């Protein structure tokens, strides 16, 4: 089962939580769900160069709070915050609600599954050899603290006549273990030969406590520890 199902969906409520965090009446649920899809599509298209990992949408009473996790927050914010204010106004028009926009920096994009998949897809579009792109991503992730990583590339790889799937793995990726903190991401590479799919699984260690927010909290704490250790090295 763990080999087939989305590893994030399998762990929801155990050590992962939802990216849309709100409740609604039966009549409003469909409308708000469509709004969430449109918001994500709009931001993904508008901020292609911002390396977006995920978009979290919360809806307190008659308000909307959008949090963008990005490896390049400067591109979203713009000069003196001008770009982020334009985005906020557009989102307010889309939702007809008072919308706030927050940016969270992803300090280690090399161990973020979605960003790894996007990077490999971009390299495939630039005609970089798929094996080289996969191995480079695996080495970077393992060097920066991942306990295991698996990458699948499928399609007409290298312009081959027959589509196939190639994969590369290093370390442990225990998909059946529910306490395992596994990040999962996908991307598509639109090449001259057709679309190639990229899937990435990153194993970041085990979470023993039963806490849906544990994975998110752990990522933030890891970023803070990394930045404080870097400051200590600079002071030394």
From Swiss-Prot:
Q: Which UniProt keywords apply?
A: Ribonucleoprotein, Ribosomal protein, RNA-binding, rRNA-binding
Domain named KH type-2: which ranges?
A: 39-107
Q: What gene name is listed for this protein?
A: rpsC
Protein species of origin: Brucella suis (strain ATCC 23445 / NCTC 10510)
Superkingdom field: Bacteria
Assembly mode:
Part of the 30S ribosomal subunit. Forms a tight complex with proteins S10 and S14.
**SS bonds (residue pairs):** none
Extract the NCBIfam families matched here: rpsC_bact
Query: InterPro entries, from UniProt?
Result: KH_dom, KH_dom-like_a/b, KH_dom_type_2, KH_sf_prok-type, Ribosomal_S3_C_sf, Ribosomal_uS3_bac-typ, Ribosomal_uS3_C, Ribosomal_uS3_CS
**GO molecular function terms listed in the Swiss-Prot or TrEMBL record:** mRNA binding; rRNA binding; structural constituent of ribosome
The family database entries (PROSITE patterns) matched by this protein are listed as:
KH_TYPE_2 (PS50823), RIBOSOMAL_S3 (PS00548)
Q: What does this protein do?
A: Binds the lower part of the 30S subunit head. Binds mRNA in the 70S ribosome, positioning it for translation.
Can you supply a Gene Ontology BP term from the record? translation
Q: One GO term of the cellular component aspect?
A: cytosolic small ribosomal subunit
The family line of this record is: Belongs to the universal ribosomal protein uS3 family.
What name goes with this protein? Small ribosomal subunit protein uS3
List all membrane-crossing ranges. none
Q: Residues annotated as region Disordered?
A: 214-236
